[in-house]
Regions:
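Short, flexible helix-loop junctions that flank or precede catalytic/ligand sites
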Residues: 1-355
Length: 355
């Protein structure tokens, strides 16, 4: 048994989302969003190196030695998988382990609204799930892939860095590819995927122009492309994609996005006030004719208003989602205020909470 397992299993018993294993510091775990010490002794560099190197294969170790950082997956059989980032720092070496459930949660498990279920019924176009690191994007996407896997008879291909949730074939053929192991980059893997007769392609990160360009083209070709960006809100997401391209191509890209985009789900996780845990606040934008026109005309500053007016088709602004959680007693007004875009709308509930 690898030495790291004892620390990981201890963290899992606390329902931790992450384990921080860093030389020069005590071992810490993030529990319901709060980082807390779980072992008081300070990790030495020698101890940290021994334990972290033990779980690296040859390719991972060479990448780490050459680049001083590496992403990879680690699994304790029948317990959990972990996404790992190992790195060098001022005091030696460290690794952060993100716990991944052994099986993907379903949309029902996540209490997702019906509009998310509806998005999973599309067979072509682009669906984006966005948010900062640790906002639950991978969990949401895995649940959406699970729903498609059960409903479709086709080929689902995922490109990840590293592979997180391992999907078993149900109605679909599942191909999962890891950047750095099965392909040198997201762009290379996505370019290859276009020749592999996919029905659905999941792109773990749309982080560069080449990847974004191929993804947009694939969506136009009739493939359902699902991807993530580290953006906050639907308007910022569309803006990021369009502005990834040179100025002389942006008009054409706006037109392509206006027709191929199916929806954007932007999310963040907040600590719950009714019981220990965290809950997702979701901003949802569906590409209605009104939204499509705004994107095509470059009027992205008006998307927020259009989202607020689109409740009848399941759209919801982030502020609307936060206020709903406050009204249900799931999060405090103060917490919602801190995460809100228009903080003035939350002054009254913030004051009520503080009293």
């Amino acid at each position: 048994m690898a030495q790291i397992n004892q620390y990981l299993e201890e963290a899992l018993k606390l329902n931790a989302s992450d384990l921080h294993f860093v030389s020069g510091d005590p071992v810490r775990a993030r529990v319901h969003g709060i980082l807390r010490v779980i072992r008081k002794e300070t990790l030495t560099t020698d101890m940290a190196e021994q334990i972290i190197y033990e779980i690296m294969d040859g390719i991972t170790r060479r990448t780490f030695d050459n680049e001083d950082a590496v992403d990879f997956a680690y699994e304790i059989p029948d317990v959990s998988r972990f996404r790992v980032n190992a790195f060098r720092h001022l005091n030696g070496i460290g690794a952060i382990f993100r716990a991944i459930p052994s099986t993907a949660l379903t949309l029902v498990d996540l209490n997702m609204p019906s509009v998310i279920h509806d998005l999973c019924k599309y067979t072509q176009g682009m669906i984006l799930v966005t948010g900062k690191t640790g906002s639950g994007k991978s969990t949401t996407l895995a649940a959406m892939i699970d729903a498609m896997n059960k409903r479709l008879k086709g080929h689902i291909l995922t490109i990840e860095d590293p592979i997180e949730f391992v999907h078993k074939a149900q109605g679909c053929l599942i191909s999962q590819r890891e950047v750095g192991v099965h392909s040198p980059s997201f762009a290379e893997a996505l370019h290859s995927a276009m020749r592999e007769d996919p029905d659905v392609v999941l792109v773990g990160e749309m982080r560069d122009l080449e990847t974004i360009s191929i993804a947009v083209t694939a969506a136009e070709m009739g493939i359902l492309v699902m991807g993530t960006l580290h953006t906050n809100g639907a308007a910022q997401t569309v803006d990021r994609i369009i502005n990834s391209f040179p100025a002389d191509k942006q008009s054409h890209i706006r037109t392509m996005i206006s027709t191929s985009l199916r929806g954007v789900v932007s999310q963040q996780l907040l600590p719950t006030s009714d019981k220990p845990g965290r809950v997702a606040a979701l901003e949802i934008m569906i590409n209605t004719p009104a939204i499509s026109n705004l994107i095509r005309q470059g009027k992205l500053d008006q998307l927020e208003t259009a989202i607020q007016s689109g409740g009848n088709v399941g759209m919801k602004s982030m502020d609307g989602a936060l206020m709903e959680l406050v009204n249900k007693g799931r999060v405090t007004g103060q917490e919602a205020y801190q995460q809100a875009n228009n903080k003035a709308k939350f002054e009254s509930v913030r004051e009520t909470t503080e009293e």
